[in-house]
Curated annotation (Swiss-Prot):
Function per UniProt: Required for normal growth in the presence of linoleic acid hydroperoxide (LoaOOH).
Annotated protein name in UniProt: Tyrosine-protein phosphatase-like protein OCA2
Subcellular location: Cytoplasm
Gene (name only): OCA2
PANTHER family recorded: TYROSINE-PROTEIN PHOSPHATASE, TYROSINE-PROTEIN PHOSPHATASE-LIKE PROTEIN OCA2
Length: 197
């Protein structure tokens, strides 16, 4: 059988867990998703109100959890909170394997992946910009890249659900936080945007 991945499909993380990015899956991609990815969760970052009917049927038949995080652009009001929602999903190992997709797999997913690269993988700004440009066909949206660079968060994440790939950056944050605190609760990690970029 021939498998066809969705537009702009690529792995983001493939270590202890699998996180993928893409454009909107079409029916010709469903076999690939079913037989190659074995997804538990799909996060749609976009402006469509609801999934297409056949897509909804596919999600239900495969028992894939579907989350819609509305995003028109990185200029949206409330975008900070929406990115935090995405991070909460990505930082819970029980949701994996995960596919994060937008309509074309370029700008909106590029913002999400850029934030993941920055906060959870310690990538440099140059690396994030280069990857963003590759998937957007060389069209680098200065507003998106500025949003990624300036993005800050302060999420509390239960330690027992954090995927292995994110633990190193979270550990570095804990060391920084511990220098100025006597709190030794130990049950949560705090995700901050303090990695050098």
């Amino acid at each position: 059988m021939k498998y066809i991945p969705p537009l702009n499909f690529s792995p983001v993380v493939s270590t202890d867990v699998s996180l993928y990015r893409s454009g909107y899956p079409m029916p010709l991609n469903y076999s690939f998703i079913k037989h190659q990815l074995h997804l538990k969760t799909i996060i749609y970052i976009g402006d469509k109100d609801r999934p297409l009917e056949e897509y909804q049927s596919f999600l239900e038949s495969e028992k894939i959890k579907y989350y819609h995080i509305f995003m028109d652009s990185s200029r949206d009001e409330g975008i900070q909170e929406r990115m935090n929602q995405v991070l909460h999903l990505v930082l819970d190992v029980r949701n994996y394997p995960i596919l994060v997709h937008s309509n074309k797999g370029k700008h909106r997913v590029g913002v999400v992946v850029g934030i993941i690269r920055k906060l959870l993988q310690g990538w440099s700004t140059a690396g994030i910009c280069q990857e963003y440009g590759l998937f957007s066909g060389g069209m680098k949206d200065g507003v998106d890249l500025e949003f990624i660079t300036m993005f800050e968060t302060n999420l509390k994440i239960p330690r027992n659900v954090i995927p292995g790939f994110a633990k190193h950056c979270l550990y570095l944050n804990e060391l920084e936080a511990a220098e100025g605190s006597d709190d030794e609760s130990g049950s949560e990690s705090i995700l901050t945007a303090k990695q050098p970029i």
